[in-house]
Amino acid sequence: MATDTAAPAAMKVDGSALAGRALAAAGARHMFGVVGIPVTSLASRAAAAGVRFLAFRNEQSAGYAAAAYGFLTGSPGLLLTVSGPGCVHGLAGLSHATANAWPLLMVSGSCSQPDAGRGDFQELDQIAATKPFIKIAVKATTIADIPRLVFQALAATVSGRPGGCYLDIPSDVLHQTLTESEAAALIDAAAADSAKSDSSPPKHKSLDEGIEKAAELLRRAERPLVVFGKGAAYSRAEDAIWKLVDTTGIPFLPTPMGKGVVPDTHPLSATAARSLAIGQCDVALVVGARLNWLLHFGEPPKWSKDVKFILVDVCEEEIELRKPHVGIVGDAKRVVELINREIKDQPFCLAPSHPWVEAITKKARDNVLKMEAQLAKDVVPFNFLTPLRIIRDAILAEGNPAPVVVSEGANTMDVGRAVLVQNEPRTRLDAGTWGTMGVGLGFCVAAAVAEPDRLVVAVEGDSGFGFSAMEVETLVRYQLPVVVIVFNNNGVYGGDRRSPDEITGPYKDDPAPTSFVPAAGYHKMMEAFGGKGYLVETPDELKSALSESFRARKPAVINVIIDPYAGAESGRMQHKN
């Protein structure tokens, strides 16, 4: 009998296998993408090395999944694409991650180096294509480059302000080989070099002074406010911020994806008194949230012209751009811990009877009562409020761990933000800084694999759902515990709302630009792949569908028929349209 006498050290390892092993050695656990030339083998080899590969139907959705994974875990999300158009499709997720300051590494195959510039298959200068959206772009020109660049690029995604990075591996490099011993040595060397590098941001020279000034400003303020965003959620600052709120009695306001860092049900929540809180506060501690359009740029008339901002951000450029009264460069969790320590030396606490606290809590209570009065009505055909109330109650009934809620759409997301309750951090994913539509089902997959003990509930407008609807097959293929609820109001913002005098011109018989096929059977898409579909038009039907699907924890689509005239065009962004 013939035997293979070759020593293990002499066995060959190609570039795909080396990349997979390097990713695993660097701590990667999940990768999202679409396979094809030249990266199919890379996906398989990475899986063999311990990196679970989640195969999508579209690189955009895979990219959004990788971005959300970075936010949820604090570790880089991995996106794998083919060359050329696959790389271009991946730019959606890559840019979304960078815009939201989430760590993501996109790995793409590219054309063979000897054929570059000659019109090779799917040829594109992918380094140039990705550069506007990333922190760094690196290219492996030989197989020996791969481990070092994997570790380098992954580290760059999380250093300083998190964001997207890009690794380009040409097809000829993926096919190059070296021995097992050479591969192991390269990975060991890359790991050792990475361990020597301190990726944590250096202590800023003005940190101590900034902490002292922040504590003193809060102590002297008559109407202080704590504002926190998804940056605080990303840094796991919830314990520190909750302690700050409880020990000082300062009201707080979360941005949409900051919801849950401190429970929405906390008595000092100013969410339902937002206009009063930002309009009258005299000192605002802003943690992990940028003073961009979401916070009205920190300017009048929404904010008082005399407000003093204490801005905490990991990015020094953000501080320099906004020019706050006090700017502190640093990790949100660490900075708030230091503020707590400083306050402990000279403690203060606003009592519930403090005029500012009383004004906030009274306004919030009054607005909540008004909202609850509207929510208590069972309106059929459905408006947005009735089904959202039923969904809210079903989600809250799940208890702990709370489901991750994915919210996408115009009216669906806007109204849902006011109705749905988050009591745990990182349990709300939405369109984010860019207001990106198309993130929904990619986010669902990311949440399901990043938080396997949680149910995932997507509350989607029918337009938002349409961007990634084919990924229902992905949900079924991996049997993920995701329930997708589609608010079906026949179009973008609603059905055909045109008045007769608007229906003119040579194409007047065409559907309105905002309208879809009425009462489309979105639930049947899920059924086509073996999942569970529900069509609901009444409160009892919705309650039954939610109860059954939540209990099953299997892929499901609940198609909720909404009055096409409910809601408003452009949601709450009419002034931008």
Curated annotation (Swiss-Prot):
Its EC number is 4.1.2.63. Thiamine diphosphate binds at residue 59. Belongs to the TPP enzyme family. The keyword Lyase applies. This is 2-hydroxyacyl-CoA lyase. GO terms for biological process: fatty acid alpha-oxidation. One of its GO terms (molecular function) is thiamine pyrophosphate binding.
